[in-house]
């Protein structure tokens, strides 16, 4: 016989005792998070070896330990050693501090557990998402409409962009015997197209372009990368030459993927110029604005995105410079007719009958079926804070970056590697008279040492053949004084370990 009382206590439901238990557990969870926030250390977990020792396995029992005891355990092994992304020294990645409104929205999203694949599973959310997509389209210059959908993030949105572009290009270049356009959805990819159809992006584009084309069966060989200029933007001369060469070789450029905010340098490609070339070669233009799309709300830097309205599709991520909790992204499509390449009717979800009666059909716009109502986070934030405060928070990081760049240029033993553009600083430590062959190792280990001690999270990447440190200065609460203090730590740490590295007596903290 089932124990319904225990079932109700375990389930989120309208049982009075279950509601009381929920309120108590949520209160305790919030208290634990508040205590974690008050600990000013950025990270307390130590090295990877220390973390593996702390989390040595997963061994649930048949009886269970109870909610409170399990919560206490999770505070110990998960919450306390988690990275504090709001800390002003947590600057390694596009990993943002989050809005309070986003945190509150998560409670509502989780409590209601709506699914966006059909209107009857999310009656309010489906309509709200359509309105928010319409608002985003107008911000981007696409005009009114609902052609777009919320996604899990940039990789999925980029997949939608290159997928639709490929199928659009094949429909334009391959025909059936009766003269109708070829449908990849119905008939698969023509054998000839596997070698002919290409996608172009810059060498600094997100790796998801290659990854997605491989998942689509086209392989890495279908992606042609072009060099970047000194500012890490797509080189327009190289792009024009690449387009011409591909055409001369009998290839078809299905899509040019531009970037508005490269992962490392924050570079924003010249969208207007790329649009002209895309038109000349009849190519789709997709822009990966996962990061730079935040400038749609900017007061001072919106012009960085001039030309975004000319693209065919756009990737946006709200869990980057929009300060929303992970995950929250969107894909915008200019021409709704191009959704035909992925449209599918399932009678139990999006029947033609429902569509004829004005029922929202979001599943036809998405690669996902079951999908969270993540749009609520952005809706709540915009409605609560307003566009002016949002713009101020977005612009803060861009202004801070310029100040940090000037400080680095004025500081001995520090060197900028790429001029700052958006909210990223690529630099390195170069001690005077230090042997060049040890510079890369020095910078790598400075970052590793500071992270292992919980003092800073600085990114490590490559600029050409040089090992670079990276600070993603998007935090709306970080100050120049915070960054100066961090750079002082960087120089102090470099001075501490540089001789041991040179002499071969240094042991990296990651070992």
Swiss-Prot record:
Keyword Lyase included in the entry's annotation: yes
A molecular function (GO) term: pyridoxal phosphate binding
GO biological process: carboxylic acid metabolic process
Pathway: Amine and polyamine biosynthesis; 1,3-diaminopropane biosynthesis; 1,3-diaminopropane from L-aspartate 4-semialdehyde: step 2/2
Alphabetized UniProt keyword annotations: Decarboxylase, Lyase, Pyridoxal phosphate
GO cellular component: cytoplasm
Entry EC number(s): 4.1.1.86
CDD domains attached to this UniProt entry: DOPA_deC_like
Cofactor: pyridoxal 5'-phosphate
Keyword Lyase included in the entry's annotation: yes
UniProt cross-references to PANTHER family, sorted A to Z: CYSTEINE SULFINIC ACID DECARBOXYLASE, GLUTAMATE DECARBOXYLASE-RELATED
Family: Belongs to the group II decarboxylase family.
Record-given protein name: L-2,4-diaminobutyrate decarboxylase
Organism: Haemophilus influenzae (strain ATCC 51907 / DSM 11121 / KW20 / Rd)
Taxonomic placement: Bacteria, Pseudomonadati, Pseudomonadota, Gammaproteobacteria, Pasteurellales
């Amino acid at each position: 016989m089932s124990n319904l009382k225990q079932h109700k206590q375990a389930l989120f439901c309208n049982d009075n005792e279950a509601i009381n238990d929920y309120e108590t557990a949520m209160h305790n969870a919030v208290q634990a998070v508040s205590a974690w926030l008050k600990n000013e250390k950025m990270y307390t977990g130590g090295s990877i070896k220390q973390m593996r020792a702390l989390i040595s396995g997963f061994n649930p029992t048949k009886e269970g330990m109870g909610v409170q005891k399990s919560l206490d355990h999770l505070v110990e092994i998960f919450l306390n050693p988690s990275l504090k992304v709001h800390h002003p020294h947590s600057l390694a990645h596009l990993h943002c501090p989050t809005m309070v409104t986003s945190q509150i929205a998560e409670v509502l999203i989780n409590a209601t557990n709506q699914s966006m694949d059909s209107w009857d599973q999310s009656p309010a959310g489906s309509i709200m998402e359509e309105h928010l997509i319409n608002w985003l389209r107008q911000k981007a210059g696409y005009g009114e409409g609902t052609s777009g959908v919320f996604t899990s993030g940039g990789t999925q949105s980029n997949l939608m962009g290159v997928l639709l572009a490929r199928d659009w290009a094949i429909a334009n270049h391959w025909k059936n015997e009766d003269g109708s356009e070829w449908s990849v959805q119905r008939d698969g990819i023509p054998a000839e197209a596997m070698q002919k159809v290409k996608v172009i992006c810059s060498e600094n584009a997100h790796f998801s372009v290659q990854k997605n084309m491989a998942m689509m069966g086209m392989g890495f060989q279908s992606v042609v990368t072009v060099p970047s200029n000194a500012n890490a933007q797509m080189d327009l001369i190289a792009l024009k030459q690449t387009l011409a060469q591909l055409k001369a070789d009998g290839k078809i450029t299905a899509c040019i993927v531009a970037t508005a905010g490269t992962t490392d340098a924050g570079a924003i490609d010249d969208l207007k110029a790329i649009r002209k070339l895309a038109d000349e070669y009849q190519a789709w233009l997709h822009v990966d604005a996962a990061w730079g799309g935040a400038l749609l709300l900017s007061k001072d830097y919106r012009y960085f995105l001039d030309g975004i309205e000319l693209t065919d599709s756009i990737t946006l991520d709200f869990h980057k410079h929009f300060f929303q909790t992970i995950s929250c992204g969107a894909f915008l499509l200019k021409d709704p007719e191009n959704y035909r390449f992925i449209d599918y009717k399932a009678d139990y979800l999006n029947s033609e009958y429902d569509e004829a009666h004005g029922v929202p059909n979001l599943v036809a716009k998405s690669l996902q079926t079951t999908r969270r109502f993540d749009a609520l986070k952005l809706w709540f934030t915009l409605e609560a804070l307003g566009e002016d405060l949002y713009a101020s928070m977005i612009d803060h990081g861009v202004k801070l970056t310029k100040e940090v760049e000037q400080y680095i240029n004025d500081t001995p033993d520090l060197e900028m590697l790429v001029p700052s553009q958006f909210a990223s600083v690529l630099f390195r430590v170069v001690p005077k008279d230090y042997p060049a062959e040890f510079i890369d190792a020095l910078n790598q280990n400075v970052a590793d040492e500071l992270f292992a001690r919980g003092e800073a999270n600085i990114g490590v990447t490559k600029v050409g053949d040089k090992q670079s440190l990276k600070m993603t200065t998007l935090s709306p609460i970080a100050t120049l004084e915070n960054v100066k203090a961090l750079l002082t730590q960087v120089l102090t740490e470099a001075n501490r370990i540089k001789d041991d590295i040179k002499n071969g007596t240094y042991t990296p903290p990651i070992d």
